[in-house]
Each structure stands twice: as C-alpha cells, then as structure tokens.
C-alpha cells in the first residue's frame, strides 16, 4: 500500500503549493509512482506549479463519483511516474462525501507509492479532510512571525487529531533577512514546536517557472528545486543533509 502525505499550512501565502509540486516531481524523478491531488476546492492552482496550467481536466470529484478509476488518471507529460488530479471548482469542501473520498484514496494507495494531498491553507473543512487520512503531514511555513505562530497552532491541531508524524518545511528562506531579523531556522523550528524536514530558499525561479508554464524541477536544477529534491530524498528515507543557502 502506498503512503499518503498531506501538505499543509496554517497561513496562506507560504508557498505550500509550489513546495508540494516540487516534492511530487522530485519523488517521480527518483522513480516512485506519485499521485498529486489538489484539494483546494474552488481555488485550484497546483496545476500551474506543475507546469500544466489549465490543461489538467480530471478532478478528484470525478474519481470519487466513480466516473473514472485511479488507473485512468492522466500522467504528467514530462514525468511519466507522476499523475495529477485537479480540484473541482463548483463545490465546497463540506460537500465532499467522506466515504467516497476515503474509497478513492484507498484505491489510490493500491496504484501509487505516494499520494500527496495539497490542502487549502487554514484549519477549515479542507484541512481536516486532508489531515484525517494522512499517514504523514508536512507543514509549510515562512519565517515571518504570523506564519510561524500559525504553524504552531496548526501543529497543535494535528496533534489533537492524533497525527504524530508531522514535520516542518521552512520556505522562502532569505539569509540576509534572517540576519536582519536576528533569527535562525532553529528558532523557527523551536517556535513552531515541530521537527524539521527541510529548508527551501527564496528563489525567483519559482515565480518564473510558473509564469513560463514550466515545472520548477525542469526549469532549474538549483535553489528551491534542489531543496525539493533533498526533501524528497528524506521522505524516501535516504540520508540527506539539510542545507540553508
């Protein structure tokens, strides 16, 4: 059975979706079969970070309804080990049938080694939907005080839900800004109260790749792309140092 990983954030604007896309493509490049699901109902944008823009047409709701099976999910044209389901645009997270969603995920676990759920920011129904079924949770935060405080609150909520494997990714790390603020990644980790999975540097290539409709890991090999590869290796259980660049 495959492993289900929820990619979460307490605060919007942390770059969670770009991190999710980077991890998914890195896992696929490493040879793992991956299904990436955009769970931000009504506000989907994971397709952009994957370099698919609006070409991704199959939503997870169609699989939940039985219109398609998991073996019919389209593969990424550049990453044959990566499949993608977009979010439906004309419903609310509260409208998702939990039993149908659970059945879809069970089927997905049988087809893929990793299932990544890109959850909406915050602690509402979409967050609970993704976290409830996750084997592991990856919490993405920035370094600004509001983001770190929200990450700590989100971690507490996950603990209350019985989620014990929760790890932190600090995104958009700028060493000059850290120096000016007189903080370190260790400070962010301590304030969030979570173990560290990885650090992703501030990188203009993330925005440029999306603008040119390119997957980040195809657009560049450095910066944020390299950081996502290191995170993927750690998720695979491989020894990989955490670097701050």
Show which residues each predicted segment covers:
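Residue-level signature of catalytic and energy-coupling elements of molecular machines
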Residues: 12, 46, 63, 118, ...
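P-loop/Walker-type NTP enzyme "switch/lid" segment
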Residues: 36-110, 210-217
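Conserved catalytic-core segment of NTP-binding enzymes
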Residues: 99-103, 107-202, 208
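Conserved beta-strand scaffold positions in the cores of enzyme catalytic domains, especially
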Residues: 4, 84, 196-199
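NTP-binding/hydrolysis catalytic cores, primarily Walker-type P-loop NTPases
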Residues: 211-245
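Short, well-ordered alpha-helices that flank and scaffold nucleotide-derived cofactor binding pockets
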Residues: 21, 25-29, 132, 153-156, ...
